[in-house]
């Protein structure tokens, strides 16, 4: 019932615009060779929800180099300002997010591996249009990262456990410079 009410409110306050879905990729992750994709949807005026995932499982066993990470996050955003059109997702936004991921990083020395780490926090960002269907979303998040990880070395063809560690980090948790593609739903002809 609540979701139906939100959907009806979103349709009636959309001022003639069709529903939009927004596909994103964080260019900072792309630069670090971590493919990623996100989907954001404005479910009510000034409110949107975003889901984001990343996956990179690169390895070179002959040199003992690993660059592996998999994970995702969800975020609830509130769009600010008097002239904001949240269905097009432009302007300033604040939000709350939660995420989980696993990783294995070794670049020829001591490696770090985690099966499950998590993060929670708050975000601030700004989204600026760079074309009719594209925008650039820049943001920063602060919060908490927690979980356990293992430090290891590679010696004589074997992986040697060094220590189990606990991560309790408070500070900057994410940076975002995302390319956003706005896709209008329910309309033929692309106009």
Protein language model regions, located:
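Residues that define the transmembrane beta-barrel architecture of outer-membrane proteins
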Residues: 19-21, 31-33, 66-72, 114-120, ...
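Flexible, solvent-exposed loop segments that connect beta-strands
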Residues: 54-69, 100-118, 147-168
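Bacterial Sec-dependent N-terminal signal peptides
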Residues: 1-13, 179, 183
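Short loop/turn motifs that connect adjacent beta-strands in outer-membrane beta-barrel proteins
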Residues: 11-19, 46, 81-91, 130-136, ...
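Outer-membrane beta-barrel "beta-signal"
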Residues: 73-79, 169-191
């Amino acid at each position: 019932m609540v979701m139906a009410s939100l959907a009806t409110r979103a349709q009636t306050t959309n001022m003639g615009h069709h529903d939009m879905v927004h596909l994103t990729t964080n260019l900072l992750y792309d630069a670090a060779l971590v493919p990623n994709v996100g989907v954001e949807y404005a479910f009510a005026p000034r409110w949107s929800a975003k889901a984001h995932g990343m996956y990179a499982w690169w390895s070179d066993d002959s040199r003992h180099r690993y660059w592996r990470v998999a994970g995702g996050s969800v975020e609830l955003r509130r769009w600010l300002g008097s002239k904001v059109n949240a269905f097009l997702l432009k302007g300033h936004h604040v939000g709350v997010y939660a995420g989980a991921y696993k990783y294995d990083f070794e670049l020829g020395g001591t490696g770090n591996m985690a099966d499950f780490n998590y993060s929670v926090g708050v975000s601030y960002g700004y989204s600026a249009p760079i074309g009719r269907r594209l925008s650039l979303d820049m943001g920063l998040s602060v919060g908490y990262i927690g979980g356990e990880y293992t430090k290891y070395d590679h010696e004589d063809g074997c992986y040697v456990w060094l220590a189990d560690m606990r991560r309790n980090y408070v500070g900057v948790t994410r940076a975002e410079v995302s390319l956003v593609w706005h896709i209008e739903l329910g309309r033929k002809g692309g106009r």
